[in-house]
């Protein structure tokens, strides 16, 4: 094998002074149409995580829900042993699921993640959602302010270097900031061309809370989108023309645009060439007029709508008029690892 292509990913400084790489590797494999967890891309993803670290990625985004913490832990251990990377060079994020929203359970969840990852601390732990429910899917109505107290506690204990949130709306963030000692460093949300989240980004910027985008391509990739999904697709002529000008792909243009907005992105892929492609966005700059053209694609279209949760307390999104449904079993309780045999 020849010299491996290397990517150089810059960092943003969080409100606690810690550096967080501007682009990370996202490790959520997703659910199948029947609501079960999708293991089909598992082996490819494990290979890609390893490859990503080899070529220069330092930021890995995972969660208890993703089931893959044990494998990530094995990869990290091997890369450190092989001298590819030092622990302090890595930025590892995990998340606490809404079934662990009590003050006692937050620490239980994080310690479980640390055990699976083989680490004594993560760089960031997030409250995955502002809601809370039992493993039977029953609303626990726990105030996220109480949950956040436990996040401040695990921070004090040194189990994590920073604490943040995910899927919180502006009102929830305002209330959290007003009633806590430690401000979240990040809010990780769905954000892409069609769903630009301007109000949320403006508020977070005013508070020095960094926005992190999961689903940075939204519904642009037809195979991953609902048939009636709105917003631009990969073959949009405007996007294709801008990509051609810079000799880049449309995905690179989208990721570059989000980077120029100051947003950290977590593109997910199980294709090695895309691992490199996604991070090869730091060698060119979109002009102001191109930036403005890309901003016009924002039609406030949310592609991820977990309507099965919309009657839970603290559900963060707008509600849709759909028949009531229950939380998929795969999001109530699970075992971890490829063989689903690790607590």
Range-by-range predicted roles:
Residues 106-126, 153-157:
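CE4/NodB-like, metal-dependent polysaccharide N-deacetylase domain
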Residues 1-90, 217-220, 322-343:
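N-terminal binding-site loop/beta-alpha segment at the start of enzyme catalytic domains
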Residues 24-40, 124, 129-141:
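Glycine-rich phosphate-binding "P-loop"
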Residues 86-100, 124-130, 190-191:
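A short, structured active-site edge motif that brings together acidic residues
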Residues 37-53, 102-116, 171-173:
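Short, acidic/polar
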Residues 14-15, 73-87, 114-120, 177-180, ...:
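Acidic (Asp/Glu)-rich catalytic clusters
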Residues 31-34, 63-71, 99-104, 133-134, ...:
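Acidic-and-aromatic substrate-binding clefts and catalytic sites of carbohydrate-active enzymes
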């Amino acid at each position: 094998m020849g010299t491996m292509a290397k990517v150089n990913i810059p960092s943003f400084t969080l409100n606690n002074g810690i550096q967080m790489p501007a682009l990370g590797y996202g490790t959520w494999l997703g659910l199948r149409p029947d609501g079960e967890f999708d293991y089909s891309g598992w082996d490819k993803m494990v290979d890609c995580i390893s490859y990503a670290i080899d070529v220069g990625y330092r930021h890995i985004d995972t969660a208890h829900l993703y089931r893959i913490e044990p494998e990530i832990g094995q990869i990290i251990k091997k890369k450190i042993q092989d001298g590819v990377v030092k622990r302090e060079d890595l930025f590892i994020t995990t998340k606490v699921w809404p079934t662990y929203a009590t003050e006692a359970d937050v620490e239980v969840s994080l310690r479980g993640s640390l055990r699976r990852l083989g680490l004594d601390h993560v760089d960031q732990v997030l409250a995955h959602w502002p809601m809370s429910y039992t493993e039977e899917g029953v609303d626990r109505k726990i105030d996220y302010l109480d949950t956040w107290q436990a996040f401040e506690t695990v921070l004090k204990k040194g189990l994590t270097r920073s604490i943040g949130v995910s899927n919180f709306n502006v009102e929830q963030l305002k209330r959290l900031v007003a009633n806590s000692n430690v401000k979240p460093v990040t809010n990780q949300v769905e954000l892409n061309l069609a769903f630009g989240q301007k109000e949320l980004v403006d508020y977070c910027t005013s508070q020095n809370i960094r926005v992190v985008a999961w689903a940075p391509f939204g519904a642009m990739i037809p195979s991953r989108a609902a048939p009636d999904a709105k917003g631009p697709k990969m073959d949009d002529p405007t996007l294709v023309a801008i990509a051609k000008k810079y000799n880049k792909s449309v995905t690179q243009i989208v990721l570059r645009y989000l980077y120029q907005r100051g947003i950290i992105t977590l593109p997910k892929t199980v294709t090695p060439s895309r691992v490199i492609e996604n991070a090869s966005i730091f060698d060119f700059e979109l002009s102001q007029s191109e930036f403005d053209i890309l901003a016009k694609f924002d039609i406030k279209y949310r592609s991820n709508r977990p309507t099965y949760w919309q009657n839970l307390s603290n559900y963060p999104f707008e509600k849709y008029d759909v028949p009531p449904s229950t939380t998929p079993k795969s999001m109530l309780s699970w075992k971890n690892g490829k063989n689903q045999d690790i607590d």
